[in-house]
Amino acid sequence: MTTIAQSVFCFLAGFFNFFLLYFRKTSRAYCKYQVVKYHSNIPMSPLTTHRLLTVKRKILVLDLDETLIHSHHDGVLRQTVKPGTPSDFTIRVVIDRHPVKFSVHERPHVDYFLSVVSQWYELVVFTASMEVYGTSVADRLDRGRGILKRRYFRQHCTMEVGGYTKDLSAIHPDLSSICILDNSPGAYRKFPHNAIPIPSWFSDPNDTCLLNLLPFLDALRFTSDVRSVLSRNMQALPETQSVQYY
């Protein structure tokens, strides 16, 4: 009798674990692909249209790791990623003559975010990671749309105490029309008035940070100098989270 009870218990436990894993994968897929609409195509008034024509088209600089995506390589799983979490895509690159496979997780709604903001801004990728890695990730995020053509990598950064910094003036000398979206305050420490902080992302399927930024970015493009708005947000995110570069 005891053996039968143990068998039933093991079966139920296995079934429960299977159901739990299936539920996690299903809920993650639902959160990622749920229909989201930001009504950016609503016709603007003549006055608003004229205002937009009088200001320069802005540049939005985008970080990759922990801002738009999170990745880990060859089975090395960060503690923030739950075991068994499926990746959105994988890339294979050669680093120091060794082939390395990266499993890449996309931040929720990143594809929709890029499709919308590319209509408002010139998009530039600026990552402190190596070019061979950053190029592969940017290619996958671009999805053949040609919206992530301009790219800057580790060799364009400056190594300082605490990590890499990114020189926005190397992208465009007019700092009034450029802003950077980055999870690492150290990356934009020399350009705090051009920064749009965003919390680091690792695996939360319910994250909505990119969606939440759309109304703000929609409005920011109308200003003549982004620093007049971004300089008011001086409460940068604390540098307590580790930054991993590839």
Curated annotation (Swiss-Prot):
Write down the chemical reaction(s) this protein catalyses.
O-phospho-L-seryl-[protein] + H2O = L-seryl-[protein] + phosphate; O-phospho-L-threonyl-[protein] + H2O = L-threonyl-[protein] + phosphate
Transmembrane segments annotated in the record for this chain: 3-23
Keywords of the record, alphabetical order, are:
Hydrolase, Membrane, Nucleus, Protein phosphatase, Transmembrane, Transmembrane helix
Tell me the ranges covered by the FCP1 homology domain, including all copies: 53-220
Q: What is its main location?
A: membrane
In alphabetical order, the GO MF annotations are:
phosphoprotein phosphatase activity; protein serine/threonine phosphatase activity
Supply the SUPFAM superfamilies for this chain: HAD-like (SSF56784)
| Its membrane topology | Single-pass membrane protein
InterPro entries recorded:
Dullard_phosphatase, FCP1_dom, HAD-like_sf, HAD_sf, TIM50
Q: Where found in the cell? A: Membrane; Nucleus envelope
| PROSITE patterns attached to this UniProt entry | FCP1
Entry's Gene Ontology BP terms = nuclear envelope organization; nuclear membrane reassembly; positive regulation of triglyceride biosynthetic process; regulation of nuclear division
What Enzyme Commission number(s) apply to this enzyme? 3.1.3.16
Gene knockout outcome: Excess of internal nuclear membranes in oocyte-derived pronuclei that are nearly or completely bisecting the nucleus in embryos during nuclear closure. Increased phosphatidylinositol (PI) production and ectopic ER sheets. Nuclei contain openings through which imported proteins passively diffuse. Increase in embryo nuclear size. Twinned nuclei after mitosis. Simultaneous knockdown of chmp-7 or lem-2 leads to enhanced nuclear sealing defects.
- Entry's Gene Ontology cellular component terms: cytoplasm; endoplasmic reticulum membrane; Nem1-Spo7 phosphatase complex; nuclear envelope; nuclear membrane
Q: Which family does it belong to?
A: Belongs to the dullard family.
Function, in words: Serine/threonine protein phosphatase that may dephosphorylate and activate lipin-like phosphatases. Lipins are phosphatidate phosphatases that catalyze the conversion of phosphatidic acid to diacylglycerol and control the metabolism of fatty acids at different levels. May indirectly modulate the lipid composition of nuclear and/or endoplasmic reticulum membranes and be required for proper nuclear membrane morphology and/or dynamics.
Q: What is this protein called?
A: CTD nuclear envelope phosphatase 1 homolog
Q: Which organism is it from?
A: Caenorhabditis elegans
Upper classification of the organism: Eukaryota, Metazoa, Ecdysozoa, Nematoda, Chromadorea
Q: Which gene encodes it?
A: cnep-1
